[in-house]
Amino acid sequence: RVLLIEQGNLGGCGGFTRSMYEALQLEGVTNHVLMDDDAVIDARVLRNLVSLLSFTGDSKVIGGHMLDLLRPHFLYEAGAVVKSNTRLKSLHHNIDLRAVDALIPFNKYQEVDYNAWWFCAIPTEQIRKAQLPAPIFIRGDDMEYGIRLKELGVKTVAMPGIAVWQTRKEPAEHLNMVQDVFFSSPKDVLEL
């Protein structure tokens, strides 16, 4: 069963948190998918996700890749890893998927530290453990939540075959440019 929660673009704390809260109130909800309202998705991606979730259950966060809507054969990002506890590094940024050699890194399982919420499936059991996102809206609020999940031992994997198309955004490592003026790490947001 799928329940679609539609709402305006209220940011992570206003929109995604509301839907997470609602999912936690419902009986029998096993996974919660977060997806940007301006993302374009092929329905087969949902089928792939459901198949994958039947194997992973409530143990892993499944992140979707972001493909460039203006250049549909370009992978814009496939998750990110934390570098030096203050920066994120995008994985597989700006890759032309028409080149066969570009596909080689996707032949192996690769965990990431974080996957943006343009498309991200989080087991409701893990949401219960991590609790709801911080009640603030700042660019990168999904990043803080992903790091929080990682610190709880929840693994995140960005899976080939699960992706959305979206107009390009800054890769994860650029999210810190403005925030660096105020915060030394994404977790400092919580110490305001």
Which role fits each region the language model picked out?
Residues 175-192:
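Catalytic core of nucleotide-sugar-dependent glycosyltransferases
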Residues 27-40:
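Short beta-strand-to-loop acidic/aromatic patch adjacent to the donor-nucleotide binding site
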Residues 115-119, 124, 128-147, 153-162:
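Donor nucleotide-sugar recognition loop
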Residues 93-120, 173:
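A recurrent flexible, glycine/aromatic-enriched loop bordering the glycosyltransferase active site
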Residues 18-19, 44, 48-52, 145, ...:
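Alpha-helical scaffold elements adjacent to nucleotide-binding pockets in ATP/GTP-utilizing enzyme cores
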Residues 2-14, 22:
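Conserved donor nucleotide-binding strand/loop of the catalytic core
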